[in-house]
Amino acid sequence: NGYREQKSWKELNIDVKKIITFYKKINISEKDRIAAYTPNQIETVECFLGASAIGSIWSSCSPDFGVPGVIERFSQIKPKLLVITDKYYYNGKEINIIERLPKILKKIKSIKSVLILNYPGKKLRKFNKIKNIKIYNFTEIRKLEISRNKLKKFDFDHELAILYSSGTTGKPKCICHRSGGVLLQHLKEHQLHCNIKPNDNVFYFTTCGWMMWNWLVTALASKASILLFDGFPMHKSPDLLLKIANKEKVTLFGISAKYIDQLIKQKVKVKEKIKLKSLKTICSTGSPLSKDGFEFVYRNIKKNVHL
């Protein structure tokens, strides 16, 4: 929808501390599971960081999964809190998420509280109260005092997040990742493989249901800024993401091989109008990038880039 929001490190820190206060207020503690059914927005990142800080276990799904996909995954982990956004947009179309809430709660009895986020730049959709479920609006969190309690230190092996297999061979399988392992692996990939530096701007086109979302968020540990995008990557313009990358001075641009294939099919000419002066690295994942894909990047996007 063209909405842009920016937060400083200080603002992020304050918001996360308020979320910690909220978690403690509703009796969320270490090893409790927090499930998120949200688009890729700042509040989702903040809720994840807050969960990590108190030792809770995070798990997220993208709104495009649909109700059966969410129930298949979250019913296995028995979350105590569900974080959900009221709606999301794809290719200009508004899609109601909050109307799915009763069906989810009916099947996942472990959920005791629901935190509703509003889609960035849009008014919150109206929602009905649900019996025996405490429902909170994210605006309530903004009014809370920041948590000043010293955070507990957890073991290297303490659980951080639960991700899922694709579900192509039956029910999606839960995969629990430890905090120390994830942090160490991501720092290695970011700083050694991708040369991410403090003050870099890191972007990856991903939803919250893909492991690249977790990879993107961890770039904060390298003192880089992260750029979030939600929606259809070619809305109104096939080179939309590249235009954003240029405007935001992105240094690492992450996409899928399928995205590059689409640029090839649509014969997008990037070099002629988008200079991408700050861009150092392009990452492609999801499937192997073809020989044509490599050649297209160097010929049409940027010659002097680490791909």
Indicate where each model-derived feature is located.
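Conserved pre-ATP/AMP-binding loop-to-beta segment of ANL
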Residues: 116, 128-164, 171, 179-181, ...
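Conserved S/T- and glycine-rich ATP-binding loop of Class I adenylate-forming
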Residues: 34, 51, 159, 165-168, ...
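Gly/Ser/Thr-rich phosphate-binding loop
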Residues: 224, 250-255, 264-307
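A short helix-loop-beta submotif of the ANL/AMP-binding
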Residues: 20, 33, 39-67, 77-82, ...
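Conserved AMP-binding/adenylation subdomain of ANL enzymes
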Residues: 181-201, 210-251, 266-269
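Conserved AMP-binding/adenylate-forming core of the ANL superfamily
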Residues: 1-49, 66-71, 134-143, 153, ...
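ATP-dependent adenylate-forming carboxylate-activation enzymes
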Residues: 38-39, 59-76, 88-89, 93-96, ...
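Structural core segment of the AMP-binding/adenylate-forming
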Residues: 53-139, 249, 256-257
